A protein has these predicted regions:
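Multi-pass membrane glycosyltransferase architecture that uses lipid-linked
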Residues: 2-283, 330-467
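Membrane-interface interhelical connector segments
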Residues: 311-326, 358-366
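Transmembrane-lumen/periplasm boundary regions of multi-pass, lipid-linked membrane glycan transferases
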Residues: 262-293, 297-313
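Helicase-core coupling region on the C-terminal RecA-like lobe
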Residues: 290, 315-343
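Secondary-structure junction/capping motif
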Residues: 66, 112, 121, 293-305, ...
Length: 467
């Protein structure tokens, strides 16, 4: 069964692209949100026999229902453009120092960061506003936004696949098509969250960083790193790991990286600083004040210990995520950044490449590129494991990198990553209330996912340096 299906979609690269495009643009992007979803749900569940077609597709509509984050993006764009907003976003963030979005719909443009407080750095802003320029309601906005994220992911997929194919010693005839097809399967495992959040942009920028490192384009490596730092802050920590993995040494090369990074940061953060001088400190303060996320490593361990001791503690919604309250959780949250830096340091140490002597031949291209890609994956995993906040959409960052590994190693890496994202999709869309309320199924599921992430991290570290 699976053999003919695989051959059908990997005969040519274009067939694989068409499959992955269908998954991302259509299949993951077809459901409803807000009041439209509620009406569909109530109508179908009340009389399934009267709506057989809706009853048949209900499981998929439920699985891919629109996310509250998309409603928040819609309200943000509406506030900036002065357009009406029919969705209520007042409860999405929970307790938060950010004021509620005012959407008077008076047609007056408002200056982002100065008149509309935002938690999204400037590189994300065009992706939030553009779909609102093209639509008049949340339903169509969500479809356009999802298609935009799908386009970014498809581009990242093709870039990653070509990195792996071009560095392989003897690539198979359909190697690129197989990688792109596998990326579509990873999207299916990850679910609609891959196109319902802004993290597709981070995924694209990270794979562009890796491509620049592979090609030895130091200024571009720095530029993409600066831009990803301006987009999401923490992923810029992948840069020092890539510098060591790709053997960037010497003042001239490091200077080119620094210059490119400065340009990327200025272009990415400059609009925020110009439009609202207090916006950057506000965003940094906002994220530093967030509590210990229930899905983070420390959050999972803390919640598990409390549950085992018979004193399970429910989280509360604040700053847009479910976090543990209390002094112990607060202390663990403060330890998250040092822990993250330590994990990245371990990956950096394992990633360092030995300098090539003049009398030696050039290093094997397959091994060199594999080291760079695995280093990027391992550093990204370190950010997940060490972070105070670990939302499932962060897993999107690694999807294009998984298919960028040369040879056939990408298959095993993609499989384990696929298990991680599949578990995440199951609990997020199936029983997330069990997670944030710390009920048994939720606690056990989080331990299972943390274990899978540990296996994934060890697999990558062993490939870097077989201790």
């Amino acid at each position: 069964m699976w053999g003919p299906l695989l051959r059908a979609f990997t005969t040519t690269t274009w067939r694989a692209v068409a499959f992955t495009a269908f998954v991302s643009f259509v299949w993951l992007n077809h459901s409803l949100g807000g009041k439209d979803w509620e009406a569909f749900r109530d109508r179908t569940l009340a009389a399934p026999a009267s709506h057989p077609f809706d009853a048949a597709r209900y499981p998929f509509m439920f699985l891919y229902r629109r996310a509250p984050d998309e409603a928040l993006y819609y309200a943000t764009a509406s506030a900036i453009l002065g357009k009406p907003c029919e969705v209520d976003t007042s409860a999405i963030r929970g307790d938060s120092p950010l004021p509620p979005l005012a959407t008077p719909g008076d047609g007056r443009l408002r200056v982002p960061y100065a008149e509309v407080p935002l938690e999204y750095p400037p590189p994300n802003l065009p992706l939030v506003v553009l779909p609102r320029l093209l639509t008049s309601a949340f339903a169509t906005y969500a479809y356009v936004f999802g298609a935009l994220m799908a386009a970014l992911l498809l581009a990242a997929c093709v870039i990653g696949a070509r990195i792996g194919v071009r560095a392989s010693r003897s690539p198979r005839e359909r190697d690129e098509a197989e990688r792109i097809f596998a990326f579509g399967l990873l999207l299916l495992a990850h679910g609609a969250i891959s196109i319902q959040r802004l993290d597709a942009l981070v995924a694209l920028l990270l794979v562009l960083m890796v491509r620049a490192a592979v090609r030895g384009e130091d200024a571009r490596l720095g530029f993409w790193a600066g831009l990803v730092g301006a987009t999401k802050f923490v992923p810029i920590l992948v840069l020092p790991v890539l510098l060591l993995a790709s053997g960037v040494r010497g003042g001239k090369r490091l200077g080119a990286v620094a210059l490119g990074g400065a340009v990327g940061l200025v272009l990415g953060l400059g609009p925020m600083i110009v439009l609202g001088q207090e916006s950057l400190p506000m965003i940094l303060s906002y994220h530093s004040a967030r509590g210990l996320h229930v899905e983070s490593t420390f959050g999972v361990l803390y919640g598990t210990v409390k549950w085992v001791l018979g004193n399970a503690e429910a989280t509360r919604l604040d700053y847009g995520s479910f976090n543990f309250p209390g002094p112990v959780a607060g202390l663990l949250g403060k330890l998250a950044m040092p822990f993250t830096l330590a994990l990245v340091g371990v990956v950096a140490y394992a990633s360092r490449s030995a300098p090539v002597r003049r009398e030696e031949s050039q290093p094997d291209e397959d091994a060199r590129v594999a080291r760079i890609v695995v280093a990027a994956l391992a550093a990204t995993t370190a950010l997940w494991l060490g972070g105070k906040v670990f939302s499932p959409q962060y897993l999107t960052w690694a999807l294009p990198l998984a298919v960028a590994l040369p040879g056939r190693a990408w298959i095993r890496v993609s499989f384990v990553l696929g298990l991680v994202v599949l578990v995440s999709q199951i609990y997020l869309r199936g029983y997330y209330d069990h997670v944030y309320n710390q009920w048994p199924a939720g606690v056990i599921t989080m331990v299972v996912r943390l274990g899978l992430l540990g296996v994934f991290s060890r697999m990558l570290l062993v490939r870097l340096r077989p201790w």
